[in-house]
């Protein structure tokens, strides 16, 4: 459940101020996860609200082409949210500008969604911290969704995904403290736990690209103790530049008190948007398919590593491609 947006982006690493043309695609945190799961052969259903006009239909079609079930999408409202993405390179970071005010989902109400019907026969519900950031009414919708999911015995995952351009840390903390009481599997990056809950790893300097992996064991345990999570996953990005990142993750399983770190990939980035979402999609797939804690985090990180090589929000990879990389084949050699 979340907002599916139009993505407008200059071609060929151009800056906004020099671009004459923009590429038109779609994306959004939870939609990106749904596409990943559909590509892995899972039955993925996406829930949102979109206008009943041609642009709203184009957004829906962008999901249908990859096998996502769009039958639960509510039609109504006037706007599809937009985000403008300027891709960075080398020492110039990427820039994202939102134009989401008065979008259909931002102006939705709890009456728009019949969650009891939506959750019939469902195993897993996923949302991110981006969606409740759209406004108090959307926080209410997320809360109703979580309550219904719990009533139906559905597992709930949430990627904290703090976005400072959408709300303040204080607003995020209040809303996410409320919503996280329902969550079973929490996903965070190396900064989200600090930004939202004030929980941070020692001896870590994000901007210098210095990650203290061991410090994130404490972060995961504090999150689990605070909210009763069953599992906590934390992605660890070492940003050498906009073009080159180190990429790994940790998965903490509370029941076994097991902390598993993935191998680290050194990435040459084509498009990092959706990188965290592709991790989430990979993790959900792995957990639903009974993979061990170590195998689950390896699959999720490998899926995300591959996404960084793919243009657009969606992760266009197969299970076999992910498993091949997770198993150690990162050569990138041509397959004949």
PLM features: residue spans?
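Positively charged, low-complexity intrinsically disordered leader regions
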Residues: 1-15
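Short catalytic helix/loop segments, enriched in acidic residues and glycine
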Residues: 15-34
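Alpha-helix C-terminal capping segments
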Residues: 25, 33-44, 286-289
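Histidine-anchored nucleotide/phosphate-binding helix
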Residues: 29-39, 142-148
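Conserved N-terminal subdomain of the carbohydrate kinase-like
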Residues: 43-132, 322-336
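A short helix->loop->beta-strand "cap" motif at the edges of active sites that frequently abuts
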Residues: 148-155, 227-230
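Conserved phosphate/ATP/ADP-binding segment of small-molecule kinases
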Residues: 166-255
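Conserved post-catalytic alpha-helical subdomain immediately downstream of the catalytic base
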Residues: 260-329
């Amino acid at each position: 459940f979340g907002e599916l947006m139009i993505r407008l982006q200059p071609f060929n690493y151009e800056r906004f101020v020099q671009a004459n043309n923009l590429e038109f695609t779609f994306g959004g945190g939870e939609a990106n996860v749904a596409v990943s799961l559909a590509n892995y052969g899972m039955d993925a259903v996406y829930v949102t609200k979109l206008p009943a006009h041609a642009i709203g239909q184009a957004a829906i079609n962008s999901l249908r082409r990859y096998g996502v079930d769009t039958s639960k999408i509510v039609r109504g409202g006037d706007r599809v949210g937009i985000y403008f993405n300027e891709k960075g390179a080398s020492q110039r970071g990427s820039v994202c500008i939102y134009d989401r005010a008065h979008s259909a989902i931002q102006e939705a109400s709890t009456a728009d969604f019949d969650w009891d019907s939506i959750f019939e026969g469902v195993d897993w519900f996923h949302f991110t911290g981006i969606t409740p950031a759209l406004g108090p009414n959307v926080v209410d919708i997320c809360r109703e969704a979580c309550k219904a999911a719990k009533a139906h015995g559905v597992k709930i995952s949430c990627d904290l995904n703090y976005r400072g351009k959408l709300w303040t840390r204080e607003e995020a903390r209040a809303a996410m403290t409320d919503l996280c009481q329902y969550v079973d599997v929490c996903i965070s990056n190396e900064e989200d736990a600090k930004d939202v809950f004030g929980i941070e790893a020692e001896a870590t300097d994000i901007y210098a690209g210095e990650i203290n992996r061991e410090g994130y064991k404490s972060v995961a345990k504090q999150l689990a103790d605070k909210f009763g999570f069953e599992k906590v996953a934390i992605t660890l990005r070492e940003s050498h530049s906009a073009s080159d990142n180190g990429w790994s993750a940790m998965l903490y399983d509370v029941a076994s008190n097991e902390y598993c770190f993935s191998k680290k990939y050194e990435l040459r980035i084509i498009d990092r948007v959706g990188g965290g979402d592709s991790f989430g999609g990979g993790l959900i797939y792995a957990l639903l398919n009974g993979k061990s804690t170590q195998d689950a985090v390896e699959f999720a990180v490998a899926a995300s590593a591959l996404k960084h090589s793919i243009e657009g929000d969606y992760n266009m990879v197969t299970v076999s491609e992910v498993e091949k990389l997770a198993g150690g084949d990162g050569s990138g050699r041509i397959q004949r």
